[in-house]
A protein has these predicted regions:
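Phosphate/diphosphate ligand-binding glycine-rich loop within oxidoreductases
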Residues: 2-118
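Glycine-rich adenosine-cofactor-binding loop
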Residues: 13, 114, 123-142
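NAD(P)-binding Rossmann-fold cofactor-contacting core
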Residues: 146-166
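Short acidic low-complexity segments
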Residues: 164-177, 181
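Residue-level detector of alpha-helical secondary structure
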Residues: 176, 180, 184-187, 198
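Charged, low-complexity interaction regions
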Residues: 188-194
Length: 207
């Protein structure tokens, strides 16, 4: 950066006003001595292509994709990191001279954080949701050695799609109309609804 021109990064989401990533990223940039700004952008699904073109045109270093763009963004990428390709969803895009590479840090971050409390290896898990974040969590947990993963989702097709994906590392269990009553070691919420709760749920684990 020279003079008053900072490098730009940001996030595309709906709703952007509820996304606290801007505070975290700008604090990290300042701590590292980087002259980079992070901008939250309100981007509805029908304007995602415009937002991507704008970021490339303005020379952004990259951007994050939050709800509801983590799967739709795949249509605009030139390449994906291997784990992101397996997950089929991206939350981080790197721009190198107009060449966009997608990465998914949701599942990796989840597993790293989880391991400070409980190792997912050999555990029975329930994942709520089947969207971008839930896909990342389920895939990375399967790769980390979870014994079983039960997907609970509102729509059958999307839930079965995710179950079939993680079946590569385990045994597929047939669809059930109700949530399983079998005791699980760990429940994780990968849905959008948890962002709107007035107070957090206290979910424990059993070992």
């Amino acid at each position: 950066m020279t003079g008053f021109l900072a490098d730009l990064t940001g996030s595309f989401a709906t709703s952007a006003a509820q996304n606290p990533t801007v505070a975290v990223m700008e604090a990290a940039y300042a701590h590292a001595g980087l002259d980079v700004r992070y901008i939250n952008c309100e981007v509805p699904p029908e304007r995602l292509e415009d937002a991507v073109r704008g970021a490339i045109g303005m020379g952004w270093l990259g951007f994050n994709c939050s709800i509801p763009h983590k799967v739709a963004i795949l249509d605009y990428l030139d390449a994906m990191a291997p784990s992101a390709g397996i997950i089929g969803a991206v939350n981080c895009v790197i721009n190198r001279d107009g060449h966009l590479t997608g990465e998914n840090t949701d599942g990796q971050g989840f597993v790293r954080s989880l391991r400070t409390v409980i190792d997912p290896s050999g555990r029975d898990m329930v994942v709520l949701g089947a969207g971008g974040a839930a896909r990342a969590i389920a895939v990375e947990s399967a790769l980390a050695g979870a014994r079983s993963i039960t997907i609970v989702n509102r729509t059958r097709d999307r839930g079965e799609e995710l179950a079939a994906l993680i079946d590569k590392w385990g045994t597929y269990e047939a669809f059930r109309d109700a949530m399983t009553t079998r005791l699980k070691n760990l429940i994780t919420d990968g849905t959008a609804t948890n962002r709107e709760l007035k107070s957090a749920m206290n979910l424990g684990y059993w070992g």
